Amino acid sequence: MSVDTYTETTKIDKLLKKPTSHFQLSTTQLYNKILDNNEGVLTELGAVNASTGKYTGRSPKDKFFVSEPSYRDNIDWGEINQPIDEETFLKLYHKVLDYLDKKDELYVFKGYAGSDKDTMLKLTVINELAWHNLFAKNMFIRPESKEEATKIKPNFTIVSVPHFKADPEVDGTKSETFVIISFKHKVILIGGTEYAGEMKKGIFSVMNYLLPMQDIMSMHCSANVGEKGDVALFFGLSGTGKTTLSADPHRKLIGDDEHGWNKNGVFNIEGGCYAKAINLSKEKEPQIFDAIKYGAILENTVVAEDGSVDFEDNRYTENTRAAYPINHIDNIVVPSKAAHPNTIIFLTADAFGVIPPISKLNKDQAMYHFLSGFTSKLAGTERGVTEPEPSFSTCFGAPFFPLHPTVYADLLGELIDLHDVDVYLVNTGWTGGKYGVGRRISLHYTRQMVNQAISGKLKNAEYTKDSTFGLSIPVEIEDVPKTILNPINAWSDKEKYKAQAEDLIQRFEKNFEKFGEKVEHIAKKGSFNK
């Protein structure tokens, strides 16, 4: 039996009007609820620490898009974007709403996603946990006042119920956990997981559908702006140095993770930052460390009885996190938007040791590497035997992009052309040999290369084309040894270098086969050795 939208809207309205539905609580009020309900503990830094239980990261296999007539032909269905039928979704949705109706307390936040007024998404977030509501308050864009919040008529609603467990046989899910996005009903339904990042990435997935439909590029990247208004974007997967390299005391942060690029320039989708906290120290990352204060949330960190935090302890997970409003960082752009990018940096951590530390890409090469989204991960064993494994994540964030990858790549190519953007591929990985033989490229040298690229000093520099990949390598960069610029020179055994490089090229080509005929033009012009 299907359930109608009228009933659904009525149930939501009823929930919002319940006397025990706490609307737009202040940070202090939410802190009190978190501590009174034993949802978290106060740390000596002023932040609260919460545990997410057994789910310490996203659950990509439990994420679905509702297959609805007006939207289904646009979505790139597959392992990442899984379909669920509308009736199955609605039955579960109403079970969740009935579950919430029986709860003693609910927490409601209204705000926005997207700092560009023309495409800003108006949000309502309904939580059963107070700390999740503080997370929403930290991560999304906050209204100026409670009065403004009351006037928000949402374009999308997040309903998050971590303690509601689905029954896969009855509810049509794959496990007790579910993240379901419906564009028709304008709902993100999350249950069975306390990992708060599902809310943030759920809205990012929605924006990655809606923005390109308006010819606006959506991007999984960090962004900053220099004193002269020059804008740089940093794309890169986990472990490539995206956060470290974009946190620059001489440049203001636009945002650390999710952005749009429209006719006016670049804008942040979020109102906060969700930083990795493992091994965090004031010495290494002072901006992030100082942002962890009253109002911030720590996830899954180890807190002693005296409130001290051990950021090096990974007993619960390597994926410890800090969620804080962007204004916890001093060096930011307000509002979080800027002009068109001058420079784009693609970061890769090549553990094979063969990709140049920096190379300049033309538009076709940029589209190729954007679609490839390459880095490498290290597979460790107890005996210490490690071999690098290539990792490809389309658009540098495959789990969050519901449309076909070429939609995003074509938009990127058009914008690079239109605004004459310089694009560089920067390898923060190994040189002189693969992992275990060579050494990690010095962060000092990487910073120097990135700074030279962003400043425009490499725009008209002298380049040489390397014979293996066909990439344009700068002949010299100030304060960087010439010997590391062309990777073959750093290897003592040149034949081993060539064999390793050829192996990586073949892996790129094999990965690109999954895109089919739609990308033949990019493969022909942008792939290696062209």
UniProtKB/Swiss-Prot annotation:
Pfam family, one: PEPCK_ATP
Essential cofactor(s): Mn(2+)
Protein's UniProt keywords contain Iron: no
GO term, biological process aspect, one: gluconeogenesis
Residues reported to bind Mn(2+): K201, H220, D257
Residue sites binding substrate per the record: R58, Y195, K201, R321
Domain of life: Bacteria
Record key words, sorted: ATP-binding, Cytoplasm, Decarboxylase, Gluconeogenesis, Lyase, Manganese, Metal-binding, Nucleotide-binding
Cofactor details (free text): Binds 1 Mn(2+) ion per subunit.
UniProt catalytic activity: oxaloacetate + ATP = phosphoenolpyruvate + ADP + CO2
Known pathway: Carbohydrate biosynthesis; gluconeogenesis
The enzyme's E.C. designation: 4.1.1.49
SUPFAM superfamilies given in the database record: PEP carboxykinase N-terminal domain, PEP carboxykinase-like
Record GO terms (molecular function): ATP binding; metal ion binding; phosphoenolpyruvate carboxykinase (ATP) activity
Residues reported to bind ATP: 201, 220, 236-244, 285, 321, 440-441, 446
Cellular-component GO terms for this entry: cytosol
Enzyme category, top tier: lyase
Role summary: Involved in the gluconeogenesis. Catalyzes the conversion of oxaloacetate (OAA) to phosphoenolpyruvate (PEP) through direct phosphoryl transfer between the nucleoside triphosphate and OAA.
Full protein name: Phosphoenolpyruvate carboxykinase (ATP)
Organism: Staphylococcus aureus (strain bovine RF122 / ET3-1)
Gene: pckA
